[in-house]
């Protein structure tokens, strides 16, 4: 009898843990750059296969006003090669500002074959920076073809006050261009717009008040101080993971704000974040995170 009782208790604990796992939003940082070339269509499809709920990605604007998926506002020397196959040097990388280049020229640069020492597990392949519209089309078609649950998107606007009209348009124009793509693709209810720059969030909060917004945080100021700068309460507060404390999580949850730490790559840190009851985790290694938090696609 005692053994049966203990077994029942163990089963309840396991079931409760499984439920908790399914509540954690597993997000593939730049599509999971620890495994695949960052911010590319192959990375996103691979992340879907792994079982993530959300694809995290970044956007910039080209000279011909196309919304391009890219973290950097220029061609990074760390992992990009020129169309002729030669490496971009650190000294010249900022000469290749994407806002000064047409998308046709951007697409000719190889972002997937150069060895990337920071991510030794990353698969190597010749691939390019995609348009946001094309990435969404590819993911949506893939999900439909394989009869999967619809996935979500967490899209960062890569902008800053000192980059206006140099690396990107002003925030109102930037925000409108990104939202135009999202609305055209009819996925707004599955999209979060995130930014360190409060300006694009403020614009979208006014023009599209129902759009889910996330404030990215890297500073050590208080939750209240950061929200005061923003001017409204966002749906999501997304701090660097070492800034997450039990007190921060409670303060955010008391205001009905989700906490989404970035970028969490070690399993021990993932487990710690989950123990703090964060709402989601952004990771370069979604394979590790899925093992800890469970698969979104698991039936």
Language-model regions, residue ranges each:
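Phosphate-group recognition and catalysis centered on beta-loop-alpha active-site segments
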Residues: 19-299
């Amino acid at each position: 009898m005692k053994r049966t009782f203990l077994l029942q208790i163990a089963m309840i604990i396991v079931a409760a843990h499984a439920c908790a796992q399914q509540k954690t939003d597993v997000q593939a940082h730049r599509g999971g750059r620890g495994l695949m070339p960052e911010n590319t269509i192959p990375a996103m499809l691979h992340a879907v296969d792994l079982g993530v709920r959300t694809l995290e990605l970044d956007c910039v604007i080209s000279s011909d006003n196309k919304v391009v998926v890219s973290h950097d506002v220029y061609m990074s020397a760390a992992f990009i090669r020129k169309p002729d196959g030669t490496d971009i040097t650190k000294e010249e990388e900022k000469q290749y500002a994407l806002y000064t280049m047409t998308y046709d020229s951007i697409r000719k640069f190889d972002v997937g074959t150069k060895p990337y020492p920071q991510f030794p597990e990353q698969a190597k392949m010749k691939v390019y920076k995609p348009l946001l519209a094309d990435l969404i089309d590819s993911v949506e078609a893939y999900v439909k073809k394989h009869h999967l649950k619809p996935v979500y998107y967490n899209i960062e606007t890569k902008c800053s006050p000192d980059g206006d009209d140099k690396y990107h348009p002003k925030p109102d124009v930037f925000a409108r261009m990104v939202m135009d793509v999202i609305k055209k693709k009819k996925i707004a209810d599955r999209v979060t717009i995130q930014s360190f720059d409060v300006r694009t969030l403020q614009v979208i909060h006014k023009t599209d008040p129902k759009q889910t917004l996330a404030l990215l945080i890297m500073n050590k100021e208080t939750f209240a101080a950061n929200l005061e700068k923003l001017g409204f309460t966002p749906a999501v507060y997304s701090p660097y993971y070492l800034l997450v404390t039990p007190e921060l999580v409670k303060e955010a949850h008391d205001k009905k704000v989700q906490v989404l730490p970035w970028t969490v790559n070690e399993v021990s840190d993932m487990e710690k974040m989950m123990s703090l009851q964060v709402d989601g985790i952004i990771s370069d290694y979604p394979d590790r995170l899925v093992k800890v938090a469970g698969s979104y696609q698991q039936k």
